């Protein structure tokens, strides 16, 4: 019983600490989803993205990044304008955010596979997002409302289970 309560406490502590991480770069790892890395992903289930990329406005990319030449400066700039507000979600490689976003970018833009992965390269950490490009806290809270309510539900269930274990 004590082992179970310690494990639950450790799980709660990890979930709280993981919510404090933030980034101002779009990691190069997000481009792996565009490169169709199948072998490693077959056995790994990814959590659902808290951002609904389905109904986003992709004209910021499709109006600037046009074929047949797909100019890198315009394409990468437009990609960063679109993606930088979601760096935290896109850099979470345990979620399907990057895969989902690239699916819709390619659906609406009809881009060749790997276009952004091959053209958009900056530093060791990935694409640098300009200061202030991340979502402000109130907008971020709206985007992540599903995650927040889900996290609260799990915390409540975990706490209830912990109390139940302690009582019996």
From Swiss-Prot:
Signal peptide as annotated in the record: 1-23
Job description of the protein: Component of the FER-regulated Rho GTPase signaling complex. Acts as a chaperone and coreceptor for FER. Required for localization of FER to the plasma membrane.
This protein's UniProt keywords: Cell membrane, Glycoprotein, GPI-anchor, Lipoprotein, Membrane, Signal
Any one biological process term the GO annotation gives: positive regulation of growth
Glycosylation sites: 57
Name listed for the protein in its UniProt record: GPI-anchored protein LLG1
Tissue expr: Expressed in pollen, pollen tubes, sporophytic pistil tissues, in the early stages of female gametophyte development, and in unfertilized, mature ovules. Expressed in roots, lateral roots, shoots, cotyledons, petioles, developing leaves and anther filaments.
Membrane topology annotation: Lipid-anchor; GPI-anchor
Propeptide residues per the UniProt entry: 145-168
Native source species: Arabidopsis thaliana (Mouse-ear cress)
Compartments where located: Cell membrane
The encoding gene: LLG1
InterPro entries: LORELEI-like
Predominant location: membrane
One Gene Ontology cellular component: side of membrane
Disruption outcome: Retarded growth, collapsed root hairs, defective trichomes, abnormal accumulation of high levels of anthocyanin and overall reduced plant size. No aborted seed phenotype and normal production of seed sets.
Lipidation positions, renumbered (GPI-anchor amidated asparagine): 144
Domain of life: Eukaryota
Subunit-structure text: Interacts with FER.
């Amino acid at each position: 019983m004590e082992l179970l309560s310690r494990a639950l406490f450790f799980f709660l502590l990890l979930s709280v600490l993981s919510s404090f991480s933030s980034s101002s770069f779009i990691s190069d790892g997000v481009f792996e989803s565009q490169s169709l890395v199948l072998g490693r992903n077959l056995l790994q289930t990814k959590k659902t993205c808290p951002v609904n990329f389905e109904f986003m406005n992709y004209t910021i990319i499709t109006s600037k990044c046009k074929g047949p030449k797909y100019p890198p400066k315009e394409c990468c700039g437009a990609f960063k304008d679109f993606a930088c507000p979601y760096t935290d979600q896109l850099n979470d490689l345990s979620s399907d955010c990057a895969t989902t976003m690239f699916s819709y970018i390619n659906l609406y833009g009809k881009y060749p596979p790997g276009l952004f992965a091959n053209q958009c390269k900056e530093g060791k950490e990935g694409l640098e997002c300009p200061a202030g490009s991340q979502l402000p806290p109130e907008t971020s809270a709206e985007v992540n409302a599903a995650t927040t309510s889900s996290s609260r539900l799990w915390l409540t269930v975990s706490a209830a289970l912990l109390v139940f274990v302690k009582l019996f």
